[in-house]
Amino acid sequence: MNNGFFNSDFDSIFRRMMKDMQGSNQVGNKKYYINGKEVSPEELAQLTQQGGNHSAEQSAQAFQQAAQRQQGQQGGNGNYLEQIGRNLTQEARDGLLDPVIGRDKEIQETAEVLSRRTKNNPILVGEAGVGKTAIVEGLAQAIVEGNVPAAIKDKEIISVDISSLEAGTQYRGAFEENIQKLIEGVKSSQNAVLFFDEIHQIIGSGATGSDSGSKGLSDILKPALSRGEISIIGATTQDEYRNNILKDAALTRRFNEVLVNEPSAKDTVEILKGIREKFEEHHQVKLPDDVLKACVDLSIQYIPQRLLPDKAIDVLDITAAHLSAQSPAVDKVETEKRISELENDKRKAVSAEEYKKADDIQNEIKSLQDKLENSNGEHTAVATVHDISDTIQRLTGIPVSQMDDNDIERLKNISNRLRSKIIGQDQAVEMVSRAIRRNRAGFDDGNRPIGSFLFVGPTGVGKTELAKQLAIDLFGNKDALIRLDMSEYSDTTAVSKMIGTTAGYVGYDDNSNTLTEKVRRNPYSVILFDEIEKANPQILTLLLQVMDDGNLTDGQGNVINFKNTIIICTSNAGFGNGNDAEEKDIMHEMKKFFRPEFLNRFNGIVEFLHLDKDALQDIVNLLLDDVQVTLDKKGITMDVSQDAKDWLIEEGYDEELGARPLRRIVEQQVRDKITDYYLDHTDVKHVDIDVEDNELVVKGK
């Protein structure tokens, strides 16, 4: 053939090109394209062979026909549905899905919507973790069992991956072509139902966002949805449904909302019982009923920011995985390989007439065989409630444990431990200790903070120190104290420092340093509002909700849980002018500074008393202990005489100012003088502190 394009010269060039490519030593590492189509080395060799017997035009036509046959084999509508999604109904037939417990109502509602003649598109709306995807899996199982209306008894639920639709669509029109193939696949199968998890992603998915006319997935699906040509099940959260789906009125009216609420604690326990067998088989760990109940109860109490049943299932899964890792299963392959090696060694020993060695090898073989037999189908560990407590502790950092004898004694002695650090304030210590014991023992109502207290009294008597010691004793970390100096919250913009700015104001997206964000990150904290009388009245209004309901809504609309915090407000109102407030009614004094509804929210209003000299004796010992801790880093020991202690108390005592002057005296007279002595005697290992001529002196050894 000789025309404008295919002629004898081109035929010769084509054959020469094929010959050069075939002779390359690196064919496997190259890519070959003919007419813009990539071909494999095998296809290239076949075309080369054809080119030897036919013209170049015939070879090109043969390649196009082969490509069309390949596209016909791979591009069928039925196959395309399998390529972009999972057939949940088939997985249900194969027994690959977990059982769905306690969701019969939602499954029934979804089945009823699917049975409609038009607009048969249910959308499951619920918060993250409540089990929306599980409901669709439950529907697939119901279809397999035949417990659905006749209109959908033959349906196949295909879970579609939206990213698979967008993959490889770098050219204009490619995405729309994929959608049309999807729609045609559903039409041709006549029984396919598409499931889009996180369906809000279809809004604008595939659109270019310009005026080029490129349409998104939702725009292409709308006509088919309204005519009932395809049926879709969607799942999304309340926020995403409001912010995305409801904004598109045309799309919204094509869906029927099915509300999915969080299951109760009782229902969650039944859910865990239903999936227990799957977890036991996977982890080879036994999971008794009391462990399942502990997963639900402890996750409700200590993981309030998440929802059931997801958080309870996670706790169960983490616990079982942890126990499985501690008791690893026998490696069957390695053990059998070792037995084979020992059999060879035994034969060699028998051949060499080393019967004692052969007998020892036989004993080792028997031990390994017994180990293999015992490991088959046996649970290697049994979970306990204490294991669940350890998991919660690893997740939250809170020392959660069962109420054993040691924990009971620790709760009983919490007041003694605090009293050893807070001198002269027994009433305040006892009131706080009672609130802690009530909460940790599980007798709290759980709808308010662990405790809320107003500490009132003169300066320097231990109000702030009690909050610090409480954070250390209760949560094991001084960083668990969130301290807010209310002098910084006295202006009218103080609310934004507490809950963050609202929409439309600067800093709306950056609320990292607010109280609500700190509590969200560390829900187990002691919150100290120091000198609360200096706060703006709007701050006190916010605290009313926190102390009454145990939660607070931040500037972005998120509800922050305060039910695992201890709220302490300190104030020296009424004590600042030398008034003898001890002889007055404390509530009468407080009403001069705070509204009655604010005072009425506290669990207790505790009056801190003036410190006398007897109390300072214990305080000076604590301050000197802190000095010794510093000296231990240098390997230096210290002895302080009683005369020196009395001298420090006499010099540092001030009834109106409390213990702070004593702290300054210890720093100036003890720490500074030890520092001066150390700089002159760097090899000192021991110092004695005494009084000579009404002066504190330091002598070393």
Swiss-Prot record:
<feature type="compositionally biased region" description="Low complexity">
    <location>
        <begin position="58"/>
        <end position="72"/>
    </location>
</feature>
<protein>
    <recommendedName>
        <fullName>ATP-dependent Clp protease ATP-binding subunit ClpL</fullName>
    </recommendedName>
</protein>
<dbReference type="InterPro" id="IPR027417">
    <property type="entry name" value="P-loop_NTPase"/>
</dbReference>
<feature type="region of interest" description="Disordered">
    <location>
        <begin position="47"/>
        <end position="79"/>
    </location>
</feature>
<dbReference type="Pfam" id="PF00004">
    <property type="entry name" value="AAA"/>
</dbReference>
<dbReference type="InterPro" id="IPR003959">
    <property type="entry name" value="ATPase_AAA_core"/>
</dbReference>
<keyword id="KW-0067">ATP-binding</keyword>
<dbReference type="InterPro" id="IPR019489">
    <property type="entry name" value="Clp_ATPase_C"/>
</dbReference>
<dbReference type="Pfam" id="PF07724">
    <property type="entry name" value="AAA_2"/>
</dbReference>
<dbReference type="InterPro" id="IPR041546">
    <property type="entry name" value="ClpA/ClpB_AAA_lid"/>
</dbReference>
<dbReference type="InterPro" id="IPR050130">
    <property type="entry name" value="ClpA_ClpB"/>
</dbReference>
<dbReference type="GO" id="GO:0005737">
    <property type="term" value="C:cytoplasm"/>
</dbReference>
<dbReference type="GO" id="GO:0005524">
    <property type="term" value="F:ATP binding"/>
</dbReference>
<comment type="function">
    <text>Required for the development of induced thermotolerance and intracellular multiplication within bovine mammary epithelial cells.</text>
</comment>
<feature type="binding site">
    <location>
        <begin position="126"/>
        <end position="133"/>
    </location>
    <ligand>
        <name>ATP</name>
    </ligand>
</feature>
<feature type="region of interest" description="II">
    <location>
        <begin position="383"/>
        <end position="575"/>
    </location>
</feature>
<comment type="similarity">
    <text>Belongs to the ClpA/ClpB family. ClpL subfamily.</text>
</comment>
<keyword id="KW-0843">Virulence</keyword>
<dbReference type="InterPro" id="IPR003593">
    <property type="entry name" value="AAA+_ATPase"/>
</dbReference>
<keyword id="KW-0547">Nucleotide-binding</keyword>
<keyword id="KW-0143">Chaperone</keyword>
<feature type="compositionally biased region" description="Polar residues">
    <location>
        <begin position="47"/>
        <end position="57"/>
    </location>
</feature>
<feature type="domain" description="UVR">
    <location>
        <begin position="336"/>
        <end position="371"/>
    </location>
</feature>
<dbReference type="GO" id="GO:0016887">
    <property type="term" value="F:ATP hydrolysis activity"/>
</dbReference>
<feature type="binding site">
    <location>
        <begin position="457"/>
        <end position="464"/>
    </location>
    <ligand>
        <name>ATP</name>
    </ligand>
</feature>
<dbReference type="Pfam" id="PF10431">
    <property type="entry name" value="ClpB_D2-small"/>
</dbReference>
<dbReference type="GO" id="GO:0034605">
    <property type="term" value="P:cellular response to heat"/>
</dbReference>
<feature type="region of interest" description="I">
    <location>
        <begin position="81"/>
        <end position="332"/>
    </location>
</feature>
<dbReference type="Pfam" id="PF17871">
    <property type="entry name" value="AAA_lid_9"/>
</dbReference>
<dbReference type="InterPro" id="IPR001270">
    <property type="entry name" value="ClpA/B"/>
</dbReference>
